[in-house]
Amino acid sequence: MARLKITQIKSKVSEKQYQRDTLRSLGLKRIGDVTVREDTAQNRGYVRTVAHLVKVEEID
């Protein structure tokens, strides 16, 4: 199964609480943090919620 490399590129300071919670669920705490997750529907939904704050790459 493919994996997603998710990098936080923008601050969460002025974002809504549910978007902050989504970043925390992904394991991202500050700008520059990187996490690798399985490519599942749940993780895709998380990424879609905070797409303006993160950069996503598919890795094998």
Swiss-Prot record:
CDD domains: Ribosomal_L30 (cd01658). GO terms for cellular component: large ribosomal subunit. Keywords: Ribonucleoprotein, Ribosomal protein. One of its GO terms (biological process) is translation. The keyword Ribonucleoprotein applies. InterPro entries: Ribo_uL30_ferredoxin-like_sf (IPR036919), Ribosomal_uL30_bac-type (IPR005996), Ribosomal_uL30_ferredoxin-like (IPR016082). Coiled coil: none annotated. The keyword Ribonucleoprotein applies. Gene3D superfamilies: Ribosomal protein L30, ferredoxin-like fold domain (3.30.1390.20). Signal peptide: none annotated. Transmembrane segments: none annotated. This is Large ribosomal subunit protein uL30. It comes from the Bacteria. Part of the 50S ribosomal subunit. Belongs to the universal ribosomal protein uL30 family. One of its GO terms (molecular function) is structural constituent of ribosome. It comes from Leifsonia xyli subsp. xyli (strain CTCB07).
